[in-house]
Amino acid sequence: MPALCATYLIHSGNLRACLRIVPLTKPSVVIAYRHLSKSSSKIAPAAALNTAPIEFTPNTSAASLHERSTVIKDAARSALRCNDTTPTPALPFDVKRVDKANRAAGRKLPAASGVLSAYALMGPYIQLAKPRLTVLVMLSAICSYALSPYPATVLELLSLTVGTTLCSAAANGINMGREPDFDRQMMRTQARPVVRGLVTPMQAYKFSAVSGVIGTAILYAGVNPTVALLGASNIVLYSWFYTSLKRKHIINTWFGAITGAIPPLMGWAAASPLTHPGCWCLAGLLYAWQFPHFNTLSHNIRNEYKNAGHVMTAWKNPKLNARVALRYSLLMFPLCFGLSYYGITDWTYQIDSALVNGWMSFWAFKFWWQQRYNYSKKVYNNKAEFNKGMVLANVYARKTFWVSVLHLPAVLILAIVHKKGRWDWLFSDEGKLVA
């Protein structure tokens, strides 16, 4: 707004009023002001600046006035363009022009000088914990705790949540620290922090040690020793046995499935004894789910596993890989029925869970049937027909994988909804108004 007013006054000829509006922080304006003051002292007595029209004396020629006016206008226009760098003793600092490039570089100075944000410091360690997998492990423990027939407490729930999360983070951190050379060879794992050099293997081990000790201590103090022992054993099973067997034998998948079955046992043991058969149905559910989920995932990246040196069923025995995925998909039916049979859920859970289990079993069956056809003698020796069949097998494997991602939370949520006794109040006569 001041710039617009000054421009108007320049063109209208009221230069002194213009110099009152334009701030005296630009050297060119200071020069213009001094020039005007010297010229005015020869024409009339000194007076304060005001907005009145300039009175010209008779002895001032038109050429002289025009020359002074041109100098002042040029100085004012230069100031309004904000690109004058002329030094002046009237200012306590040098005026320097700053372009957009310097401003952009200035914004990046804190990062360039080594000052990192909290996310830049903590981000690699959060990735070490495999947050999505850790959340799934933590939720499976919480769901099992919620399904327990015994009463729950807030302290136990918080301790179980934090302790299970830290134990899972510890196991995943050790796993990444042991396999950077192998993870570097797979597209799926190339972005891991140890592979990218954001964290060294030793830093990953230290992170895992701190997480594991704190997590186990929280489970011991806030829940009970049984849950703490299960949490510590899960760290050892995943980071040592499973990780070591990945490069030796296909049985590694079965060991990995055990680590997925332990969190439900931890949740159940937080409030109830492990002698109840219902908790083993929950553990079996998580154990069986690992196979259709992982076998179909590994099928589509089987060549990467092979090149990285991981011994997986997907490339060692493709027919067995598909058969195992179907076998454990079908095992979901009796396990869910067992939850109703042993009084964990009501009888309607058998219907709901059968629909969800049937959805995954359908795609697992198509995957197995296609692989069985692809590796038959007639098709396997025909390269064109085999390649055509593998395209379909890849599609069915991908379908089964994504169905499994939705299947597990659906089955667990339905179990909580159908927990035994949850809806008894709706059908009871307690609290009924008496006429």
From Swiss-Prot:
Annotated family: Belongs to the UbiA prenyltransferase family.
Transit peptide (residue range): 1-35
InterPro entries, per the entry: Protohaem_IX_farnesylTrfase, Protohaem_IX_farnesylTrfase_mt, UbiA_prenyltransferase, UbiA_prenylTrfase_CS, UbiA_sf
The name this protein goes by in its record: Protoheme IX farnesyltransferase, mitochondrial
Molecular-function GO term, any one: protoheme IX farnesyltransferase activity
The entry's keywords: Heme biosynthesis, Membrane, Mitochondrion, Transferase, Transit peptide, Transmembrane, Transmembrane helix
Organism expressing this protein natively: Eremothecium gossypii (strain ATCC 10895 / CBS 109.51 / FGSC 9923 / NRRL Y-1056) (Yeast)
Entry EC no(s): 2.5.1.-
Transmembrane regions listed in the UniProt entry: 135-155, 157-177, 212-232, 250-270, 324-344, 401-421
BP GO terms, sorted: heme A biosynthetic process
Location of the protein in the cell: Mitochondrion membrane
CC annotations in GO: mitochondrial membrane; mitochondrion
Segments forming a coiled coil: none
Role according to the record: Converts protoheme IX and farnesyl diphosphate to heme O.
Presence of the UniProt keyword Transferase in the record: yes
Presence of the UniProt keyword Oxidoreductase in the record: no
UniProt superkingdom: Eukaryota
Topology with respect to the bilayer: Multi-pass membrane protein
